[in-house]
Amino acid sequence: MIRPSRPLLLAVLAAVLAAVGLGGCGGAASRSGDGSGSAGAGADAATMSAGTAPAKPAGSAAGGASQARAGTAGDPWTHLRALATIGAGNRGNRAAGTPGGVATENLIASRLRDAGWAVRFERVSFPFFDERRPPLVELPGGRRLAAGGDVRTLSYSGAGDVRAPVKVVGGGRTDAGCRDGDWDGFPRGQIALVRRGVCPFAAKARRAQGAGAAAIVIEDRDANGRRGPVSGTLGAPGIRIPTVAVDGESGAGLARADGGVRVRVDAVSEQRAARNVVAELPGTAGDRVVMAGAHLDSVPAGPGVNDDGSGVAALLALADRLGRGPRPRDTLRFGFWTAEELGLYGSRAYVRSLSAAERRRVRSYVNLDMVGSPNAVLETYGSGDTEAALRRALDARGPAPAASSIGGASDHASFQRAGIEVGGVFTGASERVGAAEAKRFGARAGQPADPCYHRACDTLANVDRSMVGRVADAVEAGVRSLAG
């Protein structure tokens, strides 16, 4: 997920600013953007027919209704095991637009149908970028820059492996490369070296590509020659040449290089499509709708069993219970959103596809994103009846949840922006747990809530089973309360 509460909210804002060239995340050594905006790719929706030891025992039994249903489709752990298997068998991830993502979509649809829900897919288009190997920049003589420390790939870079002389563009000015005239006489087939500044990275890369550059290296340095490399983005696919950023010292070394320099980027950058899975259970009266959702994709770096397999599994367990029990008054609709990790593309596309009348029908939206963190701090966020229903249900099942800033870092934001009341449950990401929170929830102070956030170790061993069960039971009660 993109964290909906305090510490990572700044990182989310930085990531958004990075896409428009206004800022970045990670401190002075990892900023992105050049001071003016660049448009990102949109998303569309068209309806189609249908490693670190956890702080708490990950395998401990769930309580309440989840424990009573252990081993059945009403138990979240049943679905978590299946999601973990998909991640392990598909290059270690379930990312949108990949085989693991497709397998996740199909699993969710199958289990919802088994529970008696009407299911449909919705196609979503989004920009896809996957860096297969770290970047390589090799100077004459064989010295290589350190990937991550001296050189980084800009997201949506083109792929390639080139060796050519380096040509400094614009004499090292910060605005170098921003104007077409800066590229007059550029020797085709050489590697362009430009300094960061003034216009977006994508603007410099597009002009370099148009001038015939084999690759472009963007240098980030302050007045003393130190800084960087930036963690930046080109905003969307379209640049075909390798595009990397280096720190000031490395940039100076490239400018002095006598002979060919090698630049390699091994990545995939393209528009792709994936599917939301939307399921509905008709109510007994009226035309109001209560919604709940979770994102179905992981980051490419890991299988995402907590982020957000835990939310998906909790909702699938709820779908089974609700599908086999008495129908509520209001219609229930569950959404499993694709490409959340890339920028909320799935939920944004879904909300945009609703007419004004359809939006007014949606009474509430409940979001579940990361509800099984191994060093959990249980939080609710949202407003009105929706958060109140979740809070009451959680209060009845253990320590009262903490209140979190609503933020805009997960799929609830798409609904909130459309004027729909939202609420959600969250158990923490990479932020460290404070002493008071640790005492309240039995967590370890000073340790991350989820030490495997966005990492390859976000496996089944990284999930607190009892916490997922508690959340599933509480959300079931909350949704029943909202739906009547």
Q: What are these language model-derived features?
A:
Residues 148-178, 235-305, 317-320, 324, ...:
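Soluble metallo-hydrolase cores and metallopeptidase-like ectodomains found primarily
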